Design a protein with these regions (language model features):
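Short glycine-rich anion-binding loops that position phosphate/pyrophosphate groups of nucleotides
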Residues: 67, 131-134, 158
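Conserved SAM/SAH cofactor-binding pocket of Class I
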Residues: 46-129, 139-140
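Class I SAM-dependent transferase core
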Residues: 1-62, 78, 92-105
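Active-site capping/gating segments
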Residues: 159-201
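Residue-level signal for inorganic ion chemistry
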Residues: 22, 75, 142, 156, ...
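Conserved hydrophobic residues forming the short capping helix/wall of the S-adenosyl-L-methionine
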Residues: 26, 100-102, 146, 168-171
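Helix-to-beta-strand junctions that scaffold the AdoMet/dcAdoMet cofactor pocket
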Residues: 79, 146-148
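Conserved beta-strand signature within the Rossmann-like core of class I S-adenosyl-L-methionine
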Residues: 149-159
Length: 201
């Protein structure tokens, strides 16, 4: 795929290897459906890469409920300046993630933590969540992980604005401001809808 080659540059061979893992091992392990595997470049790899422009240089990043490693692994491949933690409570998925980062030679800057967000007591510059839960629940899980001055980025679909409206009480309680943003990794890639949460002034 030309767009992915342009976006990932010299890291493209490793991204291709990750795609191979997603479309074989991840499907076999039940971490990705066969239909999703057929759309992995657009729907997953480039969709996750679109977050990059919202992440400051040299950030510490946690991917909450990482599953098969999305969006954490594509971002780690795209951005060597990031230190990425993949947080996943389920043993099977944690094993998959640990084996995958070894295969992709990412062990020096990507770690796997087997835990639920509410059990993990560390803070990060950027907290990521993709297909984990509605925003009103995500706030309670993700905000305690956000360092002072940090941000939460939740990859959402068309329901983003509705989820922000439904989470009004939680946003006020956590003193967070929500912005619905549209970003894309490449002009030929599908747009991604992201809810960015930052501390209110």
């Amino acid at each position: 795929m030309d767009a992915a080659q342009e976006v990932y540059g010299s890291q493209y061979p490793l991204v291709s290897r990750y795609v191979d893992i997603l479309t074989t091992t991840a499907v076999e392990w039940g971490l990705m459906g066969p239909r999703e595997a057929a759309r992995v470049w657009d729907r997953h790899i480039l969709n996750c890469a679109a977050l990059s422009e919202l992440i400051p240089v040299a950030s510490s990043v946690v991917d909450v409920g990482s599953g098969a490693g999305l969006p954490g692994i594509p971002l780690a491949l795209l951005r060597p300046d990031l230190q990425v933690t993949l947080m996943e409570p389920l043993l099977r998925r944690s094993i998959f993630l640990t084996e995958t980062i070894k295969k992709l030679a990412l062990v020096d800057r990507v770690q796997v933590v087997r835990a639920r967000a509410e059990e993990h007591h560390q803070s990060y510059d950027v907290v990521l969540a993709r297909a984990v839960a509605p925003l009103d629940r995500l706030i309670g899980w993700c905000n305690p992980l956000r360092a002072t001055g940090g941000i939460i980025l939740a990859l959402k679909g068309e329901s983003a604005a509705d989820e922000v409206a439904a989470a009004k009480r939680q946003l006020e309680s956590a003193r967070l401001r929500a912005e619905v943003l549209t970003v894309r990794a490449h002009p030929d890639a599908e747009a991604a809808t992201v809810v960015r949460l930052t501390a209110r002034p």
